[in-house]
């Protein structure tokens, strides 16, 4: 639309074409520039996505600093997961002296359906694949767990022969020289991707590119794919509804859940996206016991249900 000669990018990983009118950058890059230059900055307009991070205890400063230190800059603040923002607008007007105009969002183009299941993760994936619900993104809240699931699913015959051949061709030119790279190469050959912030950029970008081409039926990763990355996913599977936030185990906030779930449903491909939440392990085990007992009253009475582990939230 604007032409390559007018577009640049600055991230923590790379810098491309910086002396141009339009720069795409991370929130932290803009915040650091605002701290360096302050009101003297020549940034005329900022389109700030994922504005719900304004309240995040770790990254929120990067959304706050530009608003408070760039008084001559016009801002467009966007979020797909905020509710009533009247109070936020009033607070911004109070702190910046600028007028805030509210734009109500349009309905979601691809509606979502939700399911809460007590099947094992492998069983859930198998049912989803059989039901034509691929591609799947399986969300974990640790990098090790994502890799463990990927290695487990790689033996399930996830990809077709045609997909495996296309993946092999598309991955040509990528160096898999590291220990993790060798593991990833094997997983990709089975149609299973891995995606998290701890990966080298070349591996992460390859997984995103393969997903965009529709070659990966399953991606196992963390909630990083829910932020700022455009990858077509039909079904999101959450392995848990709790996470460790650096201080304690807690339930996902509504915003976090909707941010992750919002990746389901491919515009232009799907009439509906699917979001599946896995029950905790003790609930899954109890469901197995109930199913095994069937309708037999004696067997049902003898069931000793597993309790939630200590500290479970």
What is each model feature region?
Residues 1-32, 90-93, 101-102, 185, ...:
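Conserved nucleic-acid-binding Ia/Ib motif block in the N-terminal RecA-like helicase ATPase lobe
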Residues 1-8, 144-218, 246-255:
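Conserved C-terminal RecA-like helicase domain
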Residues 14, 65-157, 186-197:
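Conserved interdomain linker/interface between the two RecA-like ATPase lobes of SF2 helicase motors
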Residues 29-31, 51-55, 193, 226, ...:
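Catalytic acidic motif of RecA-like/P-loop NTPases
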Residues 18-35, 190-230:
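Conserved two-lobed SF2 helicase motor
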Residues 6, 19-22, 42-45, 72-76, ...:
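Loop/turn-to-beta-strand initiation segments
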Residues 23, 27-76:
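SF2 helicase catalytic motif II
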Residues 74, 231, 235-296, 300:
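Conserved segment of the helicase C-terminal RecA-like domain
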